[in-house]
């Protein structure tokens, strides 16, 4: 493409990507990677990939590693609910707000690889489910996607970000492993993540790929975890399940709030779905 070349401080060749309309990380570094040949979704440098982590794919995966990651996500999320019930509400709310945005993975619809976390009010609304629903209070959630069917404005992007945030420690190691395999340059970077053992947000300095313009760390995600829409989602629940199951006419858009309220009072319907 007639792109000029220049050198980074670590002497890795980096391509001037001004000629690329939507440069991926492989274009940026001039590394000939084919998406079909690598395990991870090759990220764009300046915008999100319009895909999302579907936790259900980890749950149903034949890989024990994927199953283990799903279990760790559910366990950590339910422990957050326990924290909320144990009079540590401020810490639980603060943590959920942090978990609700995982910009480093670059998944979603942002054209700047940067979204916004949920509000304090929305975080409290989610955590209140651990008080309001008896089954959740006693046993926790089996799938975090269930939250989409219970709280307004919580959808696939939030579910994906929460899952990625709770797996961020794994994704850091995974990214480093894949970068070393394909010769992708790494730079010293500070990155925060939720430590599930300490039950707190910690910061680590490690070597990761970065966007030099924004200095944002970049994390890779296994492509087998990604879908455009999660297996468990509101539209499927509304169109394919709830109307047929309770035999009642609903306008899913107009009455979405009423359906979410119905779900909170009939959580057994959600679990059956």
Regions found by a protein language model. Name each.
Residues 191, 196-273:
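The feature marks a conserved, polyanion-engaging helical scaffold used by nucleic-acid processing enzymes
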Residues 7-185:
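Long, contiguous, compositionally biased segments that the model treats as domain-scale units
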Residues 182-194:
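Short, glycine/acidic-rich hinge or "gate" loops at secondary-structure transitions
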């Amino acid at each position: 493409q007639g792109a000029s070349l220049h050198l980074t401080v670590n002497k890795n060749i980096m391509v001037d990507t001004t000629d690329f309309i939507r440069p991926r990380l492989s274009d940026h570094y001039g590394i000939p990677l084919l998406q079909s040949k690598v395990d991870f979704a090759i990220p764009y440098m300046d915008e999100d990939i319009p895909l999302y982590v579907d936790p259900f794919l980890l749950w149903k995966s034949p890989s024990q590693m994927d199953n283990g990651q799903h279990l760790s996500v559910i366990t950590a999320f339910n422990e957050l609910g326990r924290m909320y019930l144990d009079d540590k509400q401020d810490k639980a709310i603060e943590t959920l707000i942090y978990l609700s945005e995982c910009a480093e993975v670059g998944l979603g619809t942002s054209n700047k690889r940067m979204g916004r976390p949920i509000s304090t009010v929305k975080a409290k609304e989610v955590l209140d489910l651990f008080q309001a629903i008896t089954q959740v209070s006693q046993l926790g959630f089996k799938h975090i996607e269930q939250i989409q069917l219970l709280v307004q404005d919580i959808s696939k992007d939030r579910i994906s970000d929460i899952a990625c945030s709770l797996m961020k420690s794994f994704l850091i190691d995974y990214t480093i492993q894949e970068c070393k395999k394909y010769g992708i340059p790494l730079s010293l970077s500070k990155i925060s993540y939720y430590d599930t053992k300490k039950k707190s947000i910690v910061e680590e300095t490690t070597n990761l790929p970065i966007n030099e313009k924004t200095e944002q760390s970049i994390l890779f995600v296994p492509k087998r975890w990604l879908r455009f829409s999660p297996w468990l989602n509101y539209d499927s629940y509304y169109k394919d399940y709830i109307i047929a199951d309770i035999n009642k006419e609903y306008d899913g858009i107009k009455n979405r709030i009423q359906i979410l309220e119905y779900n909170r009072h009939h959580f057994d319907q959600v679990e059956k779905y």
